[in-house]
């Protein structure tokens, strides 16, 4: 472009010896440039002309003098700021109005600083510590009690219950037997290792047994039927000297009449009603 043809791209007025603005390599007189290309200030709604500094944030524009905190009116030029509901706020006003308060120290958690959230509350990272060892918990596993939050090692040391069988921590649930706690999965028959959680069981020397194992190993046997006599279901039995019978098995060895609540005679561990036993060489 020669000086003889140096003119405004919009109004074609000569720019020789005049102030002008280049846009996309094309010259414009100041008046046309301001009218055609100037952005409008978000605050005062006036054009930001070529002789003014245009401050831009998320496709919004301000005069340098209009770029202020909407709450305290302090300038935000070359200062950190935050936006809320399209309002610009200095960090102090934003913190007072919008930031979370630390659950521990009750102070504001400043924008941009790391915060920890747990059960709807917020902490400074340095305030979110184990109640016992006072070490930061961060994102590590934790267990919460009314007295505070605890890292897992401290909780296990201070509060946890241990399984009587495997000696490991019981974190939830569990079964109490003989004043001892057990994991549900550890509460097994001491004989066959059957799961006893949903089963009837009996004990021997503080060890749990399923009914079958207990009867097989420890229950007295009926003299008549040789089957175990178990009191688990409330079954009645008869005991005489060192022998025991199911009540339904306590019958005369000759006529089979029930002898429960009746007098009887014995001969070589057999029992007889008085009628059948009369004339026999009985023990009693």
UniProtKB/Swiss-Prot annotation:
Example of a GO biological process term: positive regulation of transcription by RNA polymerase II
Subcellular location per UniProt equals: Nucleus
GO MF entry, a single one = zinc ion binding
- Keywords, sorted A to Z: LIM domain, Metal-binding, Nucleus, Repeat, Zinc, Zinc-finger
Q: Where is the LIM zinc-binding domain?
A: 39-100, 101-160, 161-220, 223-283
User: Do you know which CDD domains this protein is assigned to?
Assistant: LIM1_FHL (cd09343), LIM2_FHL5 (cd09428), LIM3_FHL (cd09346), LIM4_FHL (cd09347)
Segments forming C4-type zinc fingers: 8-32
> What GO terms fall under cellular component here?
nucleus; Z disc
- UniProt entry tagged with the keyword Repeat: yes
Which domain of life does the UniProt lineage start with?
A: Eukaryota
* One of the Pfam families matching this protein, by short name: LIM
What InterPro entries has UniProt attached to this entry? FHL5_LIM2, LIM_FHL1/2/3/5_N, Znf_LIM
Q: In which tissues is it expressed?
A: Testis-specific (at protein level).
Q: Which cysteines are joined by disulfide bonds?
A: none
Which PANTHER family does this one have? FOUR AND A HALF LIM DOMAINS PROTEIN, FOUR AND A HALF LIM DOMAINS PROTEIN 5
How does this protein assemble?
Interacts with CREM (via the third LIM domain). Interacts (via second LIM domain) with SPAG8.
Q: What does this protein do?
A: May be involved in the regulation of spermatogenesis. Stimulates CREM transcriptional activity in a phosphorylation-independent manner.
Identification of the protein by name = Four and a half LIM domains protein 5
């Amino acid at each position: 472009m020669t000086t003889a043809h140096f003119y405004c791209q919009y109004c074609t007025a000569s720019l020789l010896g005049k102030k002008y603005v280049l846009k996309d390599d094309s010259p414009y007189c100041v008046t046309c440039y301001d009218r055609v290309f100037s952005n409008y200030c978000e605050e005062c709604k006036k054009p930001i002309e070529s002789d003014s500094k245009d401050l831009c944030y998320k496709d919004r524009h301000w005069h340098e003098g209009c770029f202020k905190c909407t709450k305290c009116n302090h300038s935000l030029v070359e200062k950190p700021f935050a936006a809320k509901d399209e309002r610009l706020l200095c960090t102090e006003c934003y913190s007072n109005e919008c930031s979370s308060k630390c659950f521990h120290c009750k102070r504001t958690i400043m924008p941009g600083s790391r915060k920890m959230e747990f059960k709807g509350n917020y902490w400074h990272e340095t305030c979110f510590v184990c109640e016992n060892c006072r070490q930061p918990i961060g994102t590590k596993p934790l267990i919460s009690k009314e007295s505070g939050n605890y890292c897992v090692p401290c909780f296990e040391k201070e509060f946890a219950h241990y399984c009587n069988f495997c000696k490991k921590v019981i974190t939830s649930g569990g079964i109490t037997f003989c004043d001892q706690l057990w994991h549900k999965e550890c509460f097994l028959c001491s004989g066959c290792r059957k799961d006893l959680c949903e089963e009837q069981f009996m004990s021997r020397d503080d060890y749990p047994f399923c009914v079958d194992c207990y009867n097989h190993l420890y229950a007295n046997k009926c003299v008549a039927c040789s089957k175990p006599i178990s009191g688990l279901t409330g079954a009645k039995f008869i005991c005489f000297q060192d022998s025991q019978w199911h009540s339904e098995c306590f019958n005369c060895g000759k006529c089979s009449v029930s002898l429960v609540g009746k007098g009887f005679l014995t001969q070589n561990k057999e029992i007889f009603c008085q009628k059948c036993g009369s004339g026999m060489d009985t023990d009693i």
